[in-house]
Amino acid sequence: MTIVEDPEGNETSTLHAMVDFKNRRILEVGCGEGRLTWRYANKAAHVTAIDPMAEDIETARANLPDRLKGRVSFAESTIEDFARSMPERKFDIAIFAWSL
């Protein structure tokens, strides 16, 4: 069975109506396989997407469109470990989609 997420674009249009991603540094917590990442990364200056599941991060990296390479980086990490390892990092926007 194939699952199509957001087939009508409601999630994507709502996200873009609420947030201006243009030239912003984004932290996406709980990125999973990157299903949301691709929907806004083309407008952001850079996206750091983290998830504690190694398999999901591997899938997200493997499926990263060529046009977004260099604009998106992935890390296998919890938010707590990420914050401890990089306390100096600054972001304009943090997204917690499907992660709470």
Which sequence ranges carry the predicted segments?
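Class I SAM-dependent methyltransferase SAM/SAH-binding core
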Residues: R35-F82
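Conserved alpha-helix/loop element of class I SAM-dependent methyltransferases that forms part
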Residues: E5-R24
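Short catalytic micro-motifs in class I SAM-dependent methyltransferases
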Residues: W98-S99
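Short amphipathic alpha-helix with an adjacent loop that forms part of the alpha/beta core around
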Residues: D81-R89
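A conserved beta-strand element that flanks and buttresses the S-adenosyl-L-methionine
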Residues: I95
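Local beta-strand N-terminus motif with an aromatic residue
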Residues: N23, F91-D92
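Conserved class I S-adenosyl-L-methionine
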Residues: R24-G32
